[in-house]
Amino acid sequence: MLKKRKTRELAMQIMFLWDSAAQRDIDTAREYANNNTEDPEIRAAALQMAESAWEQRQMIDQRVEKIAPQWPPRRQPGVDRNLIRLAVWELTNTHTPPKVVIDEAIELSREFSTEQSPAFVNGVLDAVLKENRALVSEGTVKEE
């Protein structure tokens, strides 16, 4: 369980790096990962998770903007923005239980972001989860 937490943390930090630079630089990400964990399994998983979520960031940002129009991604703290991107990707593309994904994102926001961030991250991710469930129940998307 701790490996998954460290993987999420490292993936969020890599995405934050890319977001701050306004570009995905895989060499910088690898160097950062190498400097932050000795575990090759965590490094590989974090890089894969960050790359996958980064590729979907525009679609995720559009969803988030509909959910929280007063706080579009461009106005969110960078840590929050990238935690939300990562968590929405994980909610949509993995079989990790939603409660685990949301709880981990809240804990990471508590550790790395502002005092208000845990409530904001929770609210956005809860709305995304409800939207996902509504789409499944409508038959718009299939549940795996």
Question: In which residue ranges do the predicted regions lie?
Answer:
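N-terminal interaction/assembly modules
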Residues: 1-144
